[in-house]
Regions:
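Active-site-proximal cap/lid insertion segments
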Residues: 1-104, 117-125, 174, 180-184, ...
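Non-transmembrane alpha-helical segments in soluble domains
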Residues: 31-34, 38-45, 49, 111-115, ...
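C-terminal cap/loop subdomain of S1 sulfatases and analogous C-terminal strand-loop tails that border
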Residues: 65-71, 92, 97, 106-111, ...
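Short amphipathic beta-strand/extended segments with alternating polar/hydrophobic composition
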Residues: 102, 167, 201-203
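Intrinsically disordered, low-complexity polar regions and short flexible loop motifs
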Residues: 195
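Short amphipathic alpha-helical coupling segments at ligand-binding clamshell hinges
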Residues: 211-215
Length: 234
């Protein structure tokens, strides 16, 4: 009851007519797909080894979105919960030692990172960040938080180690309520330390209103920043 309508994935068990048998089949099918993908990645890596080009090739494994397998009674993608918004990211660079990094990054960062690794000229106008320092220092912090968008529901996510803030809707027309209202379709706030599976929305809890207002202002500033780009005059 504490989740706004805009935050409910349209691919629910009810909408998808997913009884228990179908749910088990879907999960099994997903695991099978992952196993198949793993085998194909292995084929690519073996081919690189045989070609003699492994030591001069940068390999990046990632995806454009995650996937729900029944969490929150959601299926497929589209939501801004962790299961859907987080993606795998594995980078293999010749001469770099294996490591695990925990900094927040965005897919937007990959272009800047590859440009740096390939020693291409730096472009200051890019919004993505070079994450290659993590390859030498796994503790390196690229971003304090990540930003994600679900355009179909005008949803915005700001995610840091402590909080996941999700806002649906950006503003009302000026003729309504005398001006702008951010988050007109609802807001979600999750304590990722105490509630990592995102079960309890704290957005309407009086105690956390300073946190909500801080994120609303932060998101407003973020949207202004990212829209100040080469496309604005196109």
């Amino acid at each position: 009851d504490d989740i706004p309508q805009a935050g409910i994935n349209y691919c629910t068990s009810e909408n998808m007519q997913m009884d228990l048998r179908k749910q088990k089949k879907a999960v099994g099918g997903y695991y099978a797909s992952v196993a198949y993908l793993d085998a194909q990645v292995g084929r690519v890596m073996n081919a690189l080894e045989k070609s003699g080009k492994r030591d001069e090739t940068i390999v990046i494994f990632t995806s454009d979105h995650g996937f729900h397998l029944g969490e929150h009674d959601f299926w497929a993608k589209v939501s801004l919960r962790d299961e859907s918004a987080k993606v795998p990211l594995i980078i293999s660079v010749p001469g770099k030692k294996p490591a695990v990094c925990h900094s927040f990054v965005e897919l937007l960062d990959l272009y800047s990172t590859l440009s740096s690794l390939c020693e291409l000229p730096k472009q200051d106008r890019l919004q993505g960040k070079d994450i290659s320092p993590m390859l030498d220092d796994p503790s390196y912090e690229v971003r304090e938080e990540a930003f994600c968008v679900a355009p179909m529901r005008t949803g915005f996510l700001l995610r840091n180690k402590k909080w996941a803030f999700i806002q649906y809707g950006e503003k009302l027309p000026a003729k309504l309520k005398g001006g702008f209202e951010h988050g007109r379709n609802g807001i979600e706030l999750f304590d990722m330390e105490q509630d990592p599976q995102q079960f309890t929305n704290l957005a309407d809890t009086l105690k956390y209103q300073p946190v909500v207002q801080s994120f609303r202002k932060k998101l407003q500033d973020k949207l202004v920043t990212i829209r100040n780009c080469d496309l604005k005059n196109k």
